[in-house]
């Protein structure tokens, strides 16, 4: 396979980009860490990693293991979902949120049922959606007392706002108003964040790495970020969220995954600073209480080898626990490289924190597994 035809699946899009043209796949080349790695190399490495589970039975088959360090330790349940795989399959489990009724909402790119809604015990309550082949980002927002969802679809190159039962309220097409996009295929949104005033921030994490801002009606306001060599620039802007933990200085928190970092911006897009997370290919930041949670898709030291874990930071952006990862170590106030320590996860893609502080982990390209649940250890 020629280098120019190498697909971006080596990082995140292995399955759902099948069928796209070589020209479209070129959008993903900037993210490939090693452009000599092609499909059979990835499969070989994945097979080797999977074999590692077979020769480590104490890890692979330990019942209800406890993961993490310090006061953020959790007991793992990898059989949480009670869904019938024949009736309600999943492909990539991309993101999860909890609604005000306590239900856990899962987004998958399986078009038999894009959205699966569970109770906290893992019972499947209902499903909907067959029109989101590239379902990737899922955000919930309380809009004047009514909860709504925002879905980012990689394949459709759109952001879709819906009711909790799937009725479409608004569709945002590619942001030609920016002057940065010639066609929809250049725009591959991965995440949204909604400000208190209803402004919508869209992360073009698999496209050109801009953060595009709209008002609550979907009218274009502006953009920032994008690729470049300055600190304000982004590389794989996979996620974005609103961080209100400092009431005097609320901000946007944006993933720059290939740089192993989060970056902070004002709501007008002015760069504030960078939170380095060496070794961690972080997905979207998730804020709950004083803490920041993030799935780590893979470790920099073991790319494309099912080397993910989950990281937790305190309100000062200090890593305090890694679930399935090495214990965080700071030398002279500098965080040292983190990586997977025990293979309980393959490619974690999102963390949902419920109202009882339980965690739900959605995984990409991990054998079509349903989400895992982790309960706090007191």
Predicted region positions:
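N-terminal export signals
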Residues: 41-60
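Surface-exposed loop and turn segments in beta-propeller and other repeat-based domains
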Residues: 78-87, 170-183, 221-232, 320-343
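Conserved beta-propeller blade signature
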Residues: 104-106, 148-150, 200-201, 251-253, ...
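Short loop/turn segments immediately following the C-termini of beta-strands
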Residues: 109-110, 154, 205-206, 245, ...
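Loop/turn-rich, solvent-exposed surfaces of beta-rich toroidal or solenoidal domains
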Residues: 280-326
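Blade-level signature of beta-propeller repeat domains, shared across WD40, Kelch, NHL, RCC1
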Residues: 347-378
């Amino acid at each position: 396979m020629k280098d120019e035809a190498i697909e971006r699946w080596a990082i995140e899009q292995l399955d759902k980009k099948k069928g796209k043209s070589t020209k479209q796949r070129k959008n993903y080349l900037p993210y490939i860490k090693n452009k000599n790695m092609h499909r059979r190399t990835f499969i070989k490495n994945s097979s080797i990693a999977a074999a590692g589970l077979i020769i480590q039975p104490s890890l692979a088959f330990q019942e209800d293991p406890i993961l993490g360090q310090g006061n953020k330790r959790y007991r793992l349940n990898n059989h949480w979902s009670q869904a019938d795989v024949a009736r309600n399959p999943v492909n990539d489990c991309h993101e999860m949120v909890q609604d005000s009724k306590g239900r856990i909402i899962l987004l998958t790119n399986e078009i038999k049922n894009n959205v699966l809604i569970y109770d906290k015990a893992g019972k499947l309550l209902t499903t909907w959606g067959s029109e989101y082949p590239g379902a990737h980002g899922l955000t919930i927002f309380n809009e004047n007392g009514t909860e709504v969802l925002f879905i980012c679809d990689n394949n459709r190159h759109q952001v879709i706002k819906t009711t909790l039962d799937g009725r479409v309220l608004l569709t945002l097409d590619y942001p030609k108003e920016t002057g940065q996009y010639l066609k929809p295929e250049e725009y591959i949104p991965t995440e949204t964040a909604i400000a208190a005033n209803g402004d919508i921030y869209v992360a073009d994490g698999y496209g050109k790495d801009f953060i595009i801002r709209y008002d609550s009606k979907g009218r274009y306001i502006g953009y920032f970020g994008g690729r470049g060599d300055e600190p304000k620039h982004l590389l794989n802007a996979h996620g974005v969220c609103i961080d209100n933990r400092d009431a005097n200085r609320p901000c946007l928190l944006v993933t720059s995954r290939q740089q192993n970092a989060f970056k902070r911006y004002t709501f007008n897009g002015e760069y504030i600073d960078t939170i380095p997370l060496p070794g961690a290919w972080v997905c979207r930041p998730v804020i709950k209480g004083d803490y920041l949670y993030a799935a780590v898709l893979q470790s920099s030291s073991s790319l494309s080898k099912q080397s993910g874990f989950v990281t937790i930071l305190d309100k000062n952006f200090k890593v305090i626990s890694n679930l399935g990862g090495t214990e965080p170590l700071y030398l002279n106030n500098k965080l040292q490289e983190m990586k997977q320590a025990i293979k309980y996860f393959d490619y974690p893609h999102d963390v949902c924190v419920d109202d009882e502080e339980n965690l739900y982990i959605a995984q990409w390209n991990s054998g079509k597994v349903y989400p895992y649940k982790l309960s706090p250890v007191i």
